[in-house]
């Protein structure tokens, strides 16, 4: 039986420009939570907002004692760490039951996190906003030498991707000092159990090393 974490119906409002060919100049602006509300957009989405209010999406799931965001650290962040840890806690009992093995590493992508967790009540709506893509969670068997490629990728990326089980130690110039898997030195010839998503397995975010997996297990979980 498939288990679904969260999914959301994304509403897109398309505004049409006039069909003339006048040259226009556009300035790029970063869109984030600090951008003020737009009254026209708010008017367009108000009917859908009311539908959400009347639905069970406002059901309270938990309470957060602090704000979690993916941008409060350079190589680590509170929200990325939370995502990776939560994925391990959910998936490891499932995989252990069917294989009698444990998950070694979790690697997701920072770009898959689309919102923040504010301090206070957490509703179903919050969960849907965080993960709108409903990616399939997979477990891959990777040899140690592929894990080395993973480490090199992460060093080059310098992003706070959600990671569990992999500890990477860099110097101030981002040169690798050492790394380990759950406190143990990597064995290049050993196989490791790595959890990721179908999007990343297909090369999303240029994580092409996942294609070198020895075996793929579908955990029947959607994020």
Residue ranges and their predicted role:
Residues 1-4:
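Positively charged n-region of N-terminal signal peptides that target proteins for export
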Residues 15-18:
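C-terminal motif of bacterial Sec signal peptides marking the signal peptidase cleavage site
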Residues 27-49:
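Post-signal peptide N-terminal segment of mature Sec-exported envelope proteins
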Residues 41-65:
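Post-signal-peptide N-terminal segment of Sec-exported extracytoplasmic proteins
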């Amino acid at each position: 039986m498939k288990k679904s974490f969260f999914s959301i119906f994304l509403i897109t409002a398309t505004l049409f420009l006039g069909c003339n060919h006048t040259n226009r100049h556009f300035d790029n602006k970063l869109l984030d939570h600090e951008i003020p509300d737009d009254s026209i957009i708010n008017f367009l989405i108000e009917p859908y907002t009311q539908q959400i209010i009347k639905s069970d999406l406002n059901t309270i799931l938990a309470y957060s004692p602090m704000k979690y965001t993916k941008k409060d650290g350079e190589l680590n962040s509170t929200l990325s760490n939370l995502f990776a840890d939560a994925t391990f806690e959910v998936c490891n009992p499932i995989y252990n039951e069917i294989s009698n093995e444990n998950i070694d590493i979790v690697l997701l992508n920072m770009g898959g996190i689309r919102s923040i967790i504010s301090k206070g009540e957490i509703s179903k709506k919050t969960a849907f906003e965080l993960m709108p893509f409903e990616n399939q969670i997979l477990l891959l068997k990777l040899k140690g030498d592929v894990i080395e490629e993973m480490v090199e990728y992460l060093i080059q990326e310098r992003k706070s991707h959600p990671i569990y089980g992999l500890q990477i130690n860099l110097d101030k110039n981002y040169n690798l000092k050492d790394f380990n898997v759950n406190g143990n030195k990597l064995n290049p010839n050993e196989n490791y159990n790595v959890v990721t998503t179908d999007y990343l397995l297909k090369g999303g975010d240029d994580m092409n090393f996942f294609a070198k997996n020895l075996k793929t297990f579908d955990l029947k979980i959607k994020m």
